[in-house]
């Protein structure tokens, strides 16, 4: 079984977000303002499931919940 790539429970860095977007095909970095940005989780139809700004106090905790349940790994997306 492949280990999940998750975020820290609070705010997260661009490097941490990029690790997630590289691992999951349905999670993207959006509204990039340079120092801050949103990470967005979408379902298989492309509809937004959850999003959070990287600086929010509980950003990672909320996103991790949806990464676990809705994240589509890039290594399985082509199977």
Curated annotation (Swiss-Prot):
Source domain of life: Bacteria
InterPro entries per record: DUF905, YkfF-like_sf
A Pfam short name: DUF905
Transmembrane spans: none
Family label: Belongs to the UPF0401 family.
Designated name of the protein: UPF0401 protein YkfF
This protein's encoding gene: ykfF
